[in-house]
């Protein structure tokens, strides 16, 4: 091959996709895209034909928590509220409905990019976008059409992506689908297509950020940084440093434009993060282990709860290395062939999975032959890009081990900015799922373009040994797993299995003398699952290697070889993915009313004519459920990044009070007025908890009214100022919250230090309610401090008779204002000015990107016209 073909930095020829912008046929690319459409549709053909849908927890929860936002938008000409009161007594919607008018154009372009597939099947559209994104990147790398199509299949059909579709993690998947074409824009910049690179980078960065999964975008900054380093090393070797600077600036401009188009979302996500669970607590006397705390984020144990096991990493080659998913063991046909009939019913109490994670929806499997090609790249792909991609692969695997490799993880938690903001470290394996197929395709590209790379000798050794070693590291290991599984893995029993078995024995469900026999049989069943998959992976690698050897010997041309590999890998990965996303998981679509059936308890509570109150639902997992939010303003809810102070209030006060109010309902036969409510559950009262829903037998639910709820607001006769958060949250245990307010010293200037006078005639009445605007009529003879049962958050503004006034934080989480004597209208509004400022920036960036695209198209047409 020529030096130009080996170069990392070059100007694409007119034979590439990008070269054709100046002329040439796009037909091969169109055919590849049609192939992607066909593959995506066929995978979901049964759900498409029958009109079936998935019902993921995240989706259902999103509907429940988002109902107030949708109602607001429908009644306010498409305007969006940035606040909702449906869960956790109120929180911003920045991480629930992060859509802004400036991104509506992007949403339209996304629908165009999807070729209308969502109208047929949203799930097919997701897979199509994964395929198309990687294809665009490989075409930017100058891969031929069908080679790029193969690479797209290798990336898009990695098992994890189908698993997250099933789980409903759609934002994550969309973000991942836009990452490869963003990197494609970077490649174009470094290959001399500066303006096109800026436009491609800008557009796909904007789409990626719009998809709103910061964790995935953050992880791929490691990849982008290492790839940029590879281009730098190549430029230094070729004495083209100035060109590297120009390319880097071009890529940066594109990235900045894409980020600026989404600046509204990004800024408010950052602003919210400072108040969320993802930020450092102000409490210093927490009972949690100080060594478990990170400098500015979540607890280490929480971040690393889902850590990939070191041995579990073999799932990249053999998917059932640790049993696959946390599905019932009794549902696995291979396992049940080895089950003893006496124990068969017991296996409905255990799962197939025996790994270190608390549970999993499935393994990360990149394809057995893909992994073989990845190892082949180690020997035949030259240049710094290979080493940087290998480094990224190793980094992702080491970090995915989390608590199983804690020294390395601690270093990143302590010294890498933002790394401690994200949990589920196992998900960083998405980097390996990107680099492995990319390096595999670089190896195959080398084989196709330079067949001699596998012939003859290098440094005195036959090059065919590159295939031999790569086969040994994949097919050979799979064969060993099949022949001698116990040499690598012990008894196929997890610590969770042992714990559950001990519980069953202690409860008398399983005799002690049978426990060991059951465990032995379970090991045999799981061993059978593992060895069956090991043999399967060996066969896949063997077939793929045979295709390579046939091409090397001249018995097979490159086109049929590539076609054979496409079929092999598609069949292999398709079969694995169908384990975790199959037709049986789809159901008939339900309306929201069917998904959230209104219970008798809901109907009774909804008959209340009060404008605004809150409901505590004890019949569900209160703080892991959003169904209550569909009909009520809930004390609970579900969100992975709730407000930090509210989470601390849950831990310090609400959990205990929930138990006490439950007992009080039982002891008083539902007559809570007969119990000392202000001493038993004062914090629930200050949150205006007017109703409690309790579980009954046969899934029934009982609504109980709480007469101790303090309403929407009240005057207090005293303020207890405290020096810090520790004292503030502790004082809620002893303060008379009906008549006193606990306030941090920082707000003394807002509420004043003069003595307050009691006024039995003072009233606070809510006169108007909207999610982001609350109006009150406040009457008093003496004036004073009013505490409102609303969650304090920066960005809320308040006026008294139209004049602005400051808001203080009281009782750890609530709002308080100082009101003069007389009758006044108090209005609370959440319309942050930062939204308007960031929207102006976003529109400017969008206009600049559009102008660049228009200029690029005009230049291409001009060049085409004058080349005729």
Label for each model-derived stretch:
Residues 12-97, 276, 289-301, 372, ...:
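Hydrophobic alpha-helical membrane-insertion signals
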Residues 28-66, 255-268, 395-398, 477-483, ...:
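Transmembrane signal-anchor helices characteristic of membrane glycosylation enzymes that use polyprenol
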Residues 39-134, 141, 153-176, 294-366, ...:
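Membrane-interface coil-to-helix junctions
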Residues 67, 372, 636, 690, ...:
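Active-site-proximal, structured, solvent-exposed surfaces of multi-pass membrane proteins
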Residues 74-99, 108, 321, 331, ...:
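Extracytoplasmic/lumenal acceptor-recognition loop(s) of multi-pass membrane glycoenzymes
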Residues 138-157, 195-198:
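Transmembrane-helix signature of polytopic, membrane-embedded enzymes
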Residues 168-179, 189-206, 214-216, 220-255, ...:
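Contiguous transmembrane helix-bundle modules in multi-pass membrane proteins
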Residues 308-398, 435, 447, 451, ...:
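Segments forming glycine/polar-rich beta-alpha architectures that bind adenosine-containing cofactors
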């Amino acid at each position: 091959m020529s030096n130009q073909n080996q170069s990392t930095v070059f100007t694409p020829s007119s034979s590439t996709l990008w070269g054709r912008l100046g002329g040439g046929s796009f037909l091969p690319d169109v055919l590849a895209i049609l192939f992607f459409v066909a593959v995506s549709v066929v995978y979901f053909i049964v759900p498409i034909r029958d009109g079936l849908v998935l019902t993921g927890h995240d989706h259902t929860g999103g509907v429940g928590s988002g109902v107030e936002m949708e109602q607001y938008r429908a009644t306010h000409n498409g305007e969006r509220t940035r606040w909702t009161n449906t869960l956790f007594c109120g929180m911003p919607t920045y991480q629930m409905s992060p859509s802004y008018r400036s991104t509506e154009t992007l949403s339209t372009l996304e629908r165009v990019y999807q070729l209308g597939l969502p109208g047929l099947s949203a799930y097919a559209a997701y897979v199509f976008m994964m395929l198309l994104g990687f294809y665009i990147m490989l075409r930017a790398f100058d891969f031929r059409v069908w080679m790029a199509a193969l690479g797209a299949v290798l990336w898009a059909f990695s098992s994890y992506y189908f698993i997250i579709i099933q789980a409903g993690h759609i934002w994550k998947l969309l973000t991942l689908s836009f990452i490869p074409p963003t990197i494609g824009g970077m490649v174009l910049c470094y290959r001399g297509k500066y303006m096109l690179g800026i436009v491609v980078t800008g557009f796909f960065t904007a789409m990626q950020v719009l998809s709103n999964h910061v964790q995935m975008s953050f992880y791929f900054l490691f990849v982008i940084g290492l790839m940029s380093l590879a281009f730098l090393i190549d430029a230094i070797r070729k004495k083209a440093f100035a060109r590297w600077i120009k390319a880097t600036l071009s890529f940066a401009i594109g990235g900045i434009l894409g980020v600026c188009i989404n600046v509204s979302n990004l800024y408010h996500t950052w602003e919210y993060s400072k108040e969320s669970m993802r930020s450092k607590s102000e409490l210093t006397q927490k009972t949690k282990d100080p060594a478990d705390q990170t400098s500015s984020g979540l607890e280490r144990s929480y971040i690393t709860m889902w850590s990939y096991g070191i041995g579990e990493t073999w799932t990249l080659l053999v998917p059932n290395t640790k049993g696959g998913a946390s599905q019932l063991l009794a549902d696995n046909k291979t396992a049940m062939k080895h089950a003893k009939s006496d124990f068969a019913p017991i296996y409905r109490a255990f799962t197939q999975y025996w790994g270190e994670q608390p549970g999993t929806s499935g393994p990360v499997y990149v394809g057995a032959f893909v992994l073989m090609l990845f190892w082949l790249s180690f020997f035949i792909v030259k240049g710094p890009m290979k080493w940087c991609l290998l480094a990224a692969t190793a980094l992702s695997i080491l970090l995915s081990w989390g608590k199983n490799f804690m020294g390395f993880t601690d270093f990143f938690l302590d010294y890498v900015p933002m790394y401690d903001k994200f949990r589920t470290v196992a998900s960083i394996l998405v980097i390996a799922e990107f680099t492995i197929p990319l390096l595999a395709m670089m190896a195959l590209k080398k084989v196709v373009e330079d067949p001699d790379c596998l012939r003859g000798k290098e440094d005195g050794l036959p090059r065919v040994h590159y295939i031999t070693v790569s086969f040994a590291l994949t097919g050979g290991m799979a064969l060993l797993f099949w022949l001698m599984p116990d040499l690598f893995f012990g008894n196929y029993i997890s610590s969770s299995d042992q714990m559950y078995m001990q519980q069953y024995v202690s409860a008398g469900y399983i005799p002690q003398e049978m426990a060991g026999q059951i465990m032995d049989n379970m090991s045999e069943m799981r061993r059978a699952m593992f060895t069956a998959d090991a043999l399967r992976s060996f066969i896949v690698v063997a077939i793929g290697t045979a295709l390579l050897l046939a091409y090397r010997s001249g018995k097979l041309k490159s086109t049929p070889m590539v076609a054979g590999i496409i079929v092999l890998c598609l069949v292999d990965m398709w079969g694995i993915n169908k384990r975790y996303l199959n037709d049986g998981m789809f159901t008939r679509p339900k309306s929201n009313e069917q998904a959230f059936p209104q219970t008798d308890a809901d109907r009774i509570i909804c008959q209340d004519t009060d404008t605004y109150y809150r409901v505590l639902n004890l019949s569900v997992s209160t703080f892991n459920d959003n169904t209550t939010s569909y009909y009520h303003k809930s004390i609970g809810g579900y969100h992975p990044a709730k407000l930090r102070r509210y989470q601390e209030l849950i831990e310090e006060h609400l959990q205990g009070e929930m138990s006490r109010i439950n007992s009080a309902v039982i002891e008083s036969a539902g007559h809570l007025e007969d119990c000392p409510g202000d001493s038993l559950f004062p914090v629930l009262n200050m949150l205006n908890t007017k109703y409690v829903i309790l579980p009954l037998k046969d899934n029934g639910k009982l609504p109980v009214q709480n007469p101790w709820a303090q309403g929407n607001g009240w005057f207090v006769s005293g303020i207890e100022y405290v020096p810090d958060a520790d004292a503030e949250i502790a004082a809620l245990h002893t303060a008379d919250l009906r008549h006193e307010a606990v306030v941090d010293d920082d707000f003394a200037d807002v509420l004043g230090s003069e003595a307050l006078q009691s006024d039995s005639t003072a009233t606070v009445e809510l006169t108007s309610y909207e999610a982001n605007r609350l109006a009150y009529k406040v009457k008093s003879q003496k004036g004073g401090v009013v505490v409102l049962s609303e969650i304090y958050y920066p960005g809320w503004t308040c006026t008294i008779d139209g004049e602005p006034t400051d808001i203080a934080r009281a009782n750890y989480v609530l709002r308080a204002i100082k009101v003069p004597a007389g009758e006044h209208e108090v209005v609370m509004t959440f319309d942050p000015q930062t939204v308007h400022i960031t929207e102006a920036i976003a529109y400017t960036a969008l206009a600049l990107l559009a102008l660049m695209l228009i200029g690029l198209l005009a230049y291409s047409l001009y060049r085409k016209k004058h080349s005729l």
